[in-house]
């Protein structure tokens, strides 16, 4: 029973780390990356669809993304969706392809993005600690129900703490890498 709780806690902590990585990937760096446009929704025949369902996003060079729209009639809608997104991008249209030059980040903007990334990392750490709290309370419930001994509780608390430390270290490594990437000129 305790093993199940520990495995569940480890799996949930891993998901917290993955979610934190995904949130950090959405933060724009100076380099072009297709995942930058993942959050953009396009009005496709009355329904909102993710950009990657109506167009192919690729990298032209280190500072330019290219978006090839599958349906030529959708070029205007895709361009509008990119312009109205809060990413501050200005696409240039050439037939069914949009080229999106990424402006260089100012020092002030970089610092703002670092604040956002640090906040995401802290949210990830909080989520991991919440999983730890849940796992420990589950184990203590087992102890109250006389399904395990006090020694089992101590051992499992130590194990959960090891998982927590490892996953928080993982989040910190991701944060450090993202900060380094943001500060590159």
From Swiss-Prot:
Enumerate the GO terms in the molecular function aspect. Answer: ribosomal large subunit binding
Its BP terms in the Gene Ontology are: cytoplasmic translational termination
| GO CC terms | cytosol
Q: Where in the cell is it found?
A: Cytoplasm
What InterPro entries does UniProt report for this protein, alphabetically? Ribosome_recyc_fac, Ribosome_recyc_fac_dom, RRF_sf
Q: Which UniProt keywords apply?
A: Cytoplasm, Protein biosynthesis
Give the matching HAMAP family.
Answer: RRF (MF_00040)
The similarity annotation says:
Belongs to the RRF family.
Its function?
Responsible for the release of ribosomes from messenger RNA at the termination of protein biosynthesis. May increase the efficiency of translation by recycling ribosomes from one round of translation to another.
| Official protein name in the record | Ribosome-recycling factor
From the broadest rank down, the organism's phylogenetic lineage runs:
Bacteria, Pseudomonadati, Pseudomonadota, Gammaproteobacteria, Alteromonadales
């Amino acid at each position: 029973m305790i093993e199940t709780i520990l495995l569940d806690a480890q799996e949930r902590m891993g998901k917290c780390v993955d979610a934190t990585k995904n949130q950090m990937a959405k933060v724009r760096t100076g380099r072009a990356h297709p995942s930058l446009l993942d959050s953009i929704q396009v009005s496709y025949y009355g329904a909102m669809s993710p950009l990657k369902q109506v167009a192919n996003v690729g990298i032209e060079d280190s500072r330019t993304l290219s978006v090839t729209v599958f349906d030529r009639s959708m070029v205007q809608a895709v361009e509008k969706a990119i312009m109205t997104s809060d990413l501050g991008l200005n696409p240039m249209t050439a037939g069914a392809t949009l080229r999106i030059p990424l402006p260089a980040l100012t020092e002030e903007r970089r610092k703002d993005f670092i604040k956002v990334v640090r906040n995401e990392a802290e949210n990830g750490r909080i989520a991991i600690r919440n999983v730890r709290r849940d796992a420990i309370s589950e184990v203590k419930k087992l102890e109250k129900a006389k399904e395990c001994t006090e020694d089992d509780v101590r051992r499992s608390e130590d194990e959960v703490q090891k998982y927590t430390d490892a996953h928080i270290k993982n989040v910190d490594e991701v944060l450090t890498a993202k900060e380094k990437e943001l500060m590159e000129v």
